[in-house]
Amino acid sequence: MYRRLLRPALFRLDPEDAHHLTLRALGLASAVPAWPSLVRRLTAPTDLRLTQTLWGRTFSSPLGLAAGLDKNGEAVPAFGALGFGFVEVGTVTPRAQPGNARPRLFRLPSDEALINRMGFNNAGAEALQGQLAAHFARPVPVWVNIGKNKVTPNEEAVQDYREAVRVLQAVADAFVVNVSSPNTPGLRALQAAGDLAALVRAVLDEVEAGRVRTLSRPPVLVKLAPDLHPADFEASVGAVLEAGADGLIIGNTTLRREGLTHPRRGETGGLSGRPLTARSTELVRAAYRLTRGRMPIVGVGGIFTAEDAYAKIRAGARLVEVYTALIYEGPGLPARLNRDLARLLARDGVRHLTEAVGVDL
């Protein structure tokens, strides 16, 4: 139904207008008390082979919603009802900012991809805190992706990340330190090993300082870009590990454009979707080797099928996330991926998802 009816209608709209319309509808659905729980009864993953516990939290599925789709936490209950094992909101900055000028989001249907140059448009940490506090009954863990404001120089970036943690710690089940978006000038420079280690330590210190006040100690993950030179990637992974972070997300959008066919392939911004499938899996495998399996890895990039997700798990990911595929495949995608992933495990005689992690090294 989505591919035949809804997607053609949405794809006639400007991509960002379609995004806002969809979020508004899901936000309204989230406000209906019985709707999310009713839908989740139909879509929630039930195969125990997919369930795992990480950082003291239970994930009913390894499949999560990646950051960027629900920046301000407007539709968390609705996304949780679709069959995701967790939902990542943001990127959020301490202070609200409008992001880059429109148009800033582009579909590339022939490549099953998106290009965005959004620029961390969001309502700010205080607004997100209010939204998440209102969703007191959460069907799944909610992660918060944090970044620095555009006007904040890199030398002061640490304070922005710390401020975001202070405001949001009580409502975050995990923090994701975003230093890899290509759409905020200078942000990716924070991936340099020395700067990254200092930033991660500062965020961990802030989380520890807020532990008594919030009665929570959310894990801290770091999201890296897929465009790093191999030596820089190795140094950044080492810095994250040495600083004591709790996990890695591999990776963000790419500036590469190899193999694209759509006329809008030259738009400035980060590319996501099908063109990243192989590259992101390769980087998950590299990160798993570098960490020797000591740090949970979340694989992101080009996941459209259960086979795509399974490949990342076998490369070393404990969890995976989707975004672009949801735009192309629709709201039935999470439940379908969960069912198909369980079938793949059964086909291979895998008793539990964790047995498949890293087997393809």
Curated annotation (Swiss-Prot):
Cofactor(s), names only, from the UniProt record: FMN
CDD domains: DHOD_2_like
Residues that bind FMN: 67-71, 91, 145, 178, 223, 251, 273, 302, 323-324
Enzyme active site: 181
GO molecular function, a single term: dihydroorotate dehydrogenase (quinone) activity
InterPro entries reported in the protein's UniProt record: Aldolase_TIM, DHO_dehydrogenase, Dihydroorotate_DH_2, Dihydroorotate_DH_cat, Dihydroorotate_DH_CS
CC cofactor note: Binds 1 FMN per subunit.
Residues that hold substrate according to the record: 71, 116-120, 178, 183, 252-253
Keywords (A to Z) from UniProt: Cell membrane, Flavoprotein, FMN, Membrane, Oxidoreductase, Pyrimidine biosynthesis
Catalytic function, reaction form: (S)-dihydroorotate + a quinone = orotate + a quinol
Record's bilayer topology term: Peripheral membrane protein
Main location: membrane
Coiled-coil segments on the chain, per record: none
Function, in words: Catalyzes the conversion of dihydroorotate to orotate with quinone as electron acceptor.
Subunit and interaction comment: Monomer.
PANTHER family: DIHYDROOROTATE DEHYDROGENASE (QUINONE), MITOCHONDRIAL, DIHYDROOROTATE DEHYDROGENASE (QUINONE), MITOCHONDRIAL-RELATED
Database matches in HAMAP family: DHO_dh_type2
UniProt name for this protein: Dihydroorotate dehydrogenase (quinone)
Native organism taxonomy: Bacteria, Thermotogati, Deinococcota, Deinococci, Deinococcales
Recorded name of the encoding gene: pyrD
